[in-house]
From Swiss-Prot:
Tree of life domain: Eukaryota
GO BP term (any one): negative regulation of apoptotic process
Functional description taken from the UniProt entry: Inhibits urokinase-type plasminogen activator. The monocyte derived PAI-2 is distinct from the endothelial cell-derived PAI-1. Not required for normal murine development or survival.
One Gene Ontology MF term: serine-type endopeptidase inhibitor activity
Processing after translation: The signal sequence is not cleaved.
Site features described as Reactive bond, chain residue numbers: R380, T381
Protein name per its UniProtKB record: Plasminogen activator inhibitor 2, macrophage
A Pfam short name: Serpin
Amino acid sequence: MEELSMANTMFALNLLKQIEKSNSTQNIFISPWSISSTLAIVLLGAGGNTEQQMAKVLQFNEIGSYGITTRNPENFSGCDFAQQIQKENYPSAILQAQAGDKIHSAFSSLSSTINTPQGDYLLESANKLFGEKSARFKEEYIQLSKKYYSTEPEAVDFLECAEEAREKINSWVKTQTKGEIPNLLPEGSVDEDTKMVLVNAVYFKGKWKTPFEKKLNGLYPFRVNSHESIPVQMMFLHAKLNIGYIKDLKTQILELPHTGNISMLLLLPDEIEDASTGLELLESEINFANFNKWISKDTLDEDDVVVYIPKFKLAQSYELKSILQSMGMEDAFNKGKANFSGMSERNDLFLSEVFHQASVDVTEEGTVAAGGTGAVMTGRTGHGGPQFVADHPFLFFIMDKITHTILFVGRFSSP
């Protein structure tokens, strides 16, 4: 599970960089863990170059002996396995099965740990593969999806009733997220040519370990760039927290713990020193090695900290096809090249789109709460210790500290 968390972190940071390229100044909020686990459901039925590309994008090739395929012994029919032996691939077939079982078993354990709250927080997710009813998913694939991911692909009629299929998918997502995400698929997002769509929606609400002080909250100018400000409701907290400083990037890093195993890590440059959000240098330097160094005990120390951060809610939707293609996952979306032979006997299956939405509330208590209406703030306190004043764009990560998994990553650049 530790190796999988490492792969998920690398995927999360790579995904963030790709999204940043097409969203240089906008708010960002995604759940890379949720996207990765959903794509793994598709990987379970992929083969050949399609599978290799997916494994590489998801960083599974960095884990142990992950090879050409992730198929488990259950995936090989008697004929398939016999053919492997006849081709003198018996040892590699065994290794491939073991590698695949390692990945998918680890996902099963990781999901179970994350979805079993150790504190007062809510994590609602909806992950499912929807395929054209003519696909006729293999029973072996259905059973493995249930075994590892507690879900199974669902057949819908894209060919004759695309709009009804869209409404059915949206209704399912709305139910799974308890009404928080009602319209994941926009109008026109599926049609009669759609073969398979992957949906992934996740909603997080948590309680701060130390709640913010409502009575001291108020309006404060948030600088979206070097020449523009927007009034925003600021939250105030004075508490002992882990805080650090990345000298070469002139960036503060602060840990705000939720109840349980969840923490939010915020990265805030000292000033806006570029022509956009002030985050360009920080975003360019994010990678696996740097991130681990920034959040380590070598960087973070407990101190008496005064904190101002905006109260905000983000609900961001993405169609990830082009982003995943740019990361190297090309064949899965190509009608002529996609290989999903582990899913179906049909050779014309391909992914049409991957829909993702993530939503979060950041309030005084952490969960949805009434806003305070204090006096307008015009300056900072006289506190002699470190201050963390997020009055300009910052990055934030919501992490499960037990599994070291990045559940969410976001950029807050504008109220």
